[in-house]
Amino acid sequence: MKQVTQWFVEQGWQPQAFQKECWKAYTQGLNGMLHAPTGSGKTYALWGAIIQEAFHVKKHPTGIQALWLTPLRALAIEIQQATQRMSSDLTPELKVGLRTGDTSQSERFKQKQKPSFGLVTTPESLHLLLR
């Protein structure tokens, strides 16, 4: 988790214990549930592990590799911005898309033609994607 930890330092932050635990569990292939207060860094606890793994891959597979479901559009926007921020700094070639009911037809078409590495979406939008 060297690159992600360094990214935190560059932001003027220190990883929280629960974030480090999540990163470790992810690298060990474990599943779990994360419960922490609003604004405590849950997004980076999960995305940090995903990006760290991607950082070491020489050739990234095409298509969506990480799907993030959230029930609220506003939260989806915040998560997409946070995950893209980290991705842009550590793995600029990996994009994080956003798909909600507000996504334009032209953007949906682009997403279909060239899927991003990560996609943040709502259950309703995922349902429409899978139809």
PLM regions with names:
Residues 2-131:
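Conserved P-loop/Walker A NTP-binding site and adjacent catalytic elements of P-loop NTPases
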